[in-house]
Amino acid sequence: MTEATTIPSVTLSNGVVMPAIGFGVFQIPDDAMDATVRHALAAGYRAFDTAPMYGNERSLGRPLTDSGVPRQELFVTTKVSNEDQGYQSTRDAVEKSVARLGLDYVDLCLIHWPAPARGTYLDTWRALEALHARGLGPAVGGSNFQPD
């Protein structure tokens, strides 16, 4: 095993501190997740990035909760898929993601793609703010937004 490395952190605009480098689990199959996460934790990773469309939230949550690393030392990000955008569907989708992960909350929940043609990303954002206020996510944001 590699000796764990201390990863620098960044402070978000709302004061939430997150590791500057995270471990993405896109395309990691369920049968490889336990060993992969164990090695990532041993190497010092504490931030993990997933999404419902990756199909592996449940298999990521298991090794994280079984790792013995205190929850407050982990930083878990998930995302809202395009088909889940809209106020109520976003709320439902995030609650399902948290349940699949086997956690009480996610540290960061992102709008995976803005999909402006759908006209729902503002309602999606409002839902993320409401979930944040309920404690299901200390931080919210967007990914893959374009400059225009």
Residue ranges of predicted features:
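Short beta->alpha linker loops
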Residues: 52-55, 82, 144-145
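Hydrophobic faces of well-ordered beta-strands that scaffold small-molecule active sites
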Residues: 19-24, 48, 74-78, 106-111, ...
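Active-site mouth loops of central-metabolism enzymes
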Residues: 19-31, 78-88, 113-119
